[in-house]
Amino acid sequence: MYYGFDIGGTKIALGVFDSTRRLQWEKRVPTPHTSYSAFLDAVCELVAEADQRFGVKGSVGIGIPGMPETEDGTLYAANVPAASGKPLRADLSARLDRDVRLDNDANCFALSEAWDDEFTQYPLVMGLILGTGVGGGLVLNGKPITGQSYITGEFGHMRLPVDALTLMGFDFPLRRCGCGQMGCIENYLSGRGFAWLYQHYYDQSLQAPEIIALWEQGDEQAHAHVERYLDLLAVCLGNILTIVDPDLLVIGGGLSNFTAITTQLAERLPRHLLPVARAPRIERARHGDAGGMRGAAFLHLTD
């Protein structure tokens, strides 16, 4: 059995998957905020419960925001203060007497989608998250590509390309990102960015769902806004896809629920790619809230 943990600032979620990659059981508990020992106990107790329930010693994978293992072997995860700065992988491997694998939660999202029954036919899968921020991951032949700093797939911190300024206007404001840089595409393509663009051009403060509702009602202003957003997304993705050249692009996050993104993006991409390039198949993520647990569990699939 494959045990996958999706750990965030508020909850520790465990999903148990069988050899056919089907979810057999799941359980969630609150994330301890201050005590590292309480945090370790919470994870170990869930593993012990799963071992007893299924009569096996399952493999353990964990998806967690941040950098799963720094140079000194410790976790960096600002949203999980009880475990940040601690040697989480080593400590859990020792306590559970098995190889515990950690990866970034965005990489686990991409891995979950790459192991979808239909998507396993694609060697190179790119996951793109358009949510509170912009992120994602890359999976090659069923294995995540992590890089030395676990930042592979941090697409949101690429800068706006010059073609974006041609589209938006050269007086378009370059916003300061939370990472400290200027002009990161996360500030324009995330759910927050979607709403900010609307306010910038129309001087109206609406949230993304409200704008999308107007678009669905045929509102001309919302329609123009969505067209501009999709053109900007295509411009930025053109650079990324030229570097990565994936077979499949899976889009997740809150904005993936807006069907225009997956249905209208493909027709905009070719003008931003090399003439010989083929745009990837574009699909909406299929596994929702279970994706983090799935991807973490599947860190052990390709041994």
Swiss-Prot record:
It catalyses: N-acetyl-D-glucosamine + ATP = N-acetyl-D-glucosamine 6-phosphate + ADP + H(+). Gene3D superfamilies: 3.30.420.40. Pathway: Cell wall biogenesis; peptidoglycan recycling. Belongs to the ROK (NagC/XylR) family. NagK subfamily. HAMAP family: GlcNAc_kinase. Catalyzes the phosphorylation of N-acetyl-D-glucosamine (GlcNAc) derived from cell-wall degradation, yielding GlcNAc-6-P. This is N-acetyl-D-glucosamine kinase.
